Structure formats: structure tokens, C-alpha cells
Amino acid sequence: DTVNDATAFLETFFKLYPTATEKELAYYVSGNVLEPIGRDYLYSELINPIFTKDGENVKVKVAVKFLDNQTKATQVSQYELVLHKDSNWKIIG
């Protein structure tokens, strides 16, 4: 189902996102919607994702918990994203 699919996509994406290059991000993100983080963060979990169907797209509000490998501190970042699925999911906004 859409929510499970989108959740799995986001988990995969946020595992890669902290260390991804712009070229790698291009597979998951349309244009420059998200800038590379370029930090040694380790994905921990999605916190309370809220999905809203918006025509062909799915909007998601989510907090993402990362572990900073340098400081061992927990970092929580808020995201509001628009997802679209053709053959694969992509973050378009």
C-alpha cells in the first residue's frame, strides 16, 4: 500500500542522505529540493510520519532522528516533503 511503500522509500533515502553526493541524491530527489548534508550522521528512525494524499502526489511531514557519529549526539531534523511515484518514488518538493 502507498503508506508502507512511501515509508520504505523514506527509510532507504534517509539512510543514504547524510553522506550522499549531489549525483547520488539525483536518483531520489528532483532538482535541488534537498541540499546534501555532507555529515557523518547515522539514520536512526522516522518519527511520526504524517502522509497526506495530494492528487498524484503524497505529502509527508516527518521528523528524522540521526546519530552524529562525531559527537554521539542525537540530531532530529524536521522535513516536509512531496513524494511522487512513477516507476520509483522521488522527492519532488
Where are the regions that the model predicts?
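Short beta-strand edge/turn micro-motifs at domain boundaries
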Residues: 1, 78-93
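Residue-identity detector for glycine
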Residues: 6, 31, 36-38, 48-49, ...
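Surface-exposed, charged secondary-structure patches
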Residues: 42-80, 84-85
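Core segments of small alpha/beta cavity-forming domains
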Residues: 1-40
